[in-house]
C-alpha cells in the first residue's frame, strides 16, 4: 500500500491484514508490502517540488540557443562515437531519437521506491566497491578500516539495503539501479549492478547484489525531498555521470495511463561535446574533459571539443518551443506520434535535461516495468511491444506506439548554463578525492 507521511516526519506504509481462524494476520496476497508502487504516479509523485517540476516558461535562453537546437538535430545519430580520438570513423545509426525501456533497447536505470518503516520490509545484501566521483573533501582521517570518510560511505551504499525480493537492475548497458527509501530518506544509486547472485546469500540469507559504483543522498523522509534536496543531486557517487537522481525524469507507465507527464524529461545524449582535451607528444587525444551545467556535477562528453560552442551539456535545461503544436509536425504535415505528443507537452512546461551519454542516438528513458510487476504479481512487462502501454498509446497500431523518432530537436530552446544555481553553492563539481575545489560563489554575491 502507499505510504503516508505522519506529522512527526516519519513515513509508514500501511500493512494489509486478513482475519484467519479468528486472528488478524498479514495478508497472504500482498506482494512486497514495503514497495511503494505509486511513487511516480502524477498525482502524488516523489519528484514533487524538485527541480524536475520547475516551470520553464521564463527560462533565460543561452545566446546560442538556436545553434544548440540545430546541433542537437544534426548530430543524432552521433557521427563521431568514441573512435574519432584514434582517427577512426565511428558513431551511431538508425532513428534520430530512441526510447529505452526494460522490454527493449538499452535498459535505463531501474528505480525501486520502498518504505523501510514497514514491518515487513525485505532486505538484500549489497557489496559496492566505491562511491565513484566522491564529494570533494571527504574526511581522510585514518581508521583501522580505511579513511574515515570512505568507511562512512560504505555504511550507506553497502551492507543491508531495503530492497524487494526479485528486484533486478537494468539487464544490459550500464546495469543501473536506484533505491529510494522514503522511510529513512536515504536515496541510493548504483552502477554496474549484478544480482541477485544465484550462488550466494547474505549474513541472514538475504539475496546478494554487487555494484561497481554507488552513490547516495540523505533527505527528509516521505515523498517530498525538496527542502533538503531540491536539485535532486547525490551527495556523493552516482549511477549516471550527472550525479543526480535522474530517474525522476523517466517516463512511468502510470503517466501514460494518466495521459500526462508532470516533470522534466531526463534524456541521454547521443552526442555531446567535450569542452577540452589533453594530447600526447604526437598530438593524439589521451583525455577528454567536459564541463557540466548545474544541477549536474560531472560530464562524460565524448564529441570533439571543436563542437563545444554549439553543443548543450549535461545538466543544461532545454525546452520545446511553446508554438509547437503536438498535432502538427511541420516536417510531415501530420500529427506527431502519440508518445512524442506527450513528451512535447511535458517539455514545453517542465523542460528536458541531458543526464548521460550513449555515443549513439538521443534517447528518452522509461521506468523499469519490474517494480510494477513485483507489486501486482503480473508476469508481463507493461512496456512489452504490443503490450498494455503500447495499446493505450496507439490502439490501432500498437507496434508503432513507442516510435518517438519525430521528436522535434530542431524546435527546442536551450537555457543559460547553470540556470538556477544557488549564489553560494557548497556542492562543487566532482573531482578526485581530497582535491582542492572550493565551493561556488556567484560573481553577483562577491
State what each model feature region is.
Residues 2-11:
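Surface-exposed, short loops/turns at beta-strand junctions within beta-sandwich domains
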Residues 12, 25-27, 208:
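Short, isolated positions in well-ordered beta-strands
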Residues 13-17:
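Extracellular recognition modules
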Residues 18-20, 191:
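Residue-level signal for short segments within beta-strands and strand-turn junctions
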